[in-house]
């Protein structure tokens, strides 16, 4: 259901059209947040999900968070190394949830910027490079043809998070989670700490 809104460009140059597209994305994000808020009757939490390497990502999320103030509670972000995510989220008083595929990636994010806004870190989403459809990366030291078990990678992530005082922050296992029975040994596991699952 719904009404298709045609995308009509008025700009003549590529730059002008790009700016129009960003504004269109901002308006769309605000509209979606309002619809979700109304459908939920103001109950529950609404999170935005953005691809960091998308053109104009920072402008889009800044615009959406400004225009939908109080409606969005968290921002999940991956597809790249979203260094500025913590700063943007903190400025708008929302939690941030970076998507990483290794402890190494989180270490870089933490040291460069996340440590400055640690109180707004709502969780760390782990998407396994071999199970999550291949849209997240491996480092040059990892072999794409030799899958590693996600348990050891998440345990390494948790160990690193503990060294930063983040034992209370949940890890969200995402990508390749279809049956909770396959993950029973992860639940209430002291090595992994607080963990939740995103199915799919």
Where are these regions (language model features)?
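Active-site entrance/lid segments in N-terminal catalytic domains of soluble metabolic enzymes
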Residues: 1-164
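Catalytic alpha/beta core domains of metabolic enzymes, predominantly
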Residues: 138-199
């Amino acid at each position: 259901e719904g009404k298709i809104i045609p995308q009509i460009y008025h700009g003549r140059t590529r730059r002008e059209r790009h700016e129009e597209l960003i504004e269109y994305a901002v308006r769309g994000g605000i509209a979606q947040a309002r619809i979700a808020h109304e459908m939920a009757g103001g109950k529950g939490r609404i999170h935005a999900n953005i691809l960091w390497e998308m053109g104009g990502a920072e402008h889009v999320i800044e615009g959406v968070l400004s225009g939908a103030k109080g409606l969005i509670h968290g921002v999940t972000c991956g597809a790249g190394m979203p260094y500025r995510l913590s700063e943007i989220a903190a400025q708008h008083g929302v939690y941030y949830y970076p998507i990483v595929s290794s402890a190494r990636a989180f270490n870089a994010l933490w040291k460069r910027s996340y440590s400055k806004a640690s109180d707004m870190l709502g969780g760390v989403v782990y998407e396994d490079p071999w199970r999550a459809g291949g849209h997240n990366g491996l480092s040059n030291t990892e072999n794409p043809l030799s899958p590693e078990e996600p348990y050891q990678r998440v345990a390494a992530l948790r160990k690193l998070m503990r060294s930063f005082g983040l034992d209370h922050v949940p890890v969200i296992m995402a990508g390749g989670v279809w049956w909770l029975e396959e993950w029973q040994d992860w639940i209430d596991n002291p090595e992994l700490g607080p963990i939740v699952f995103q199915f799919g």
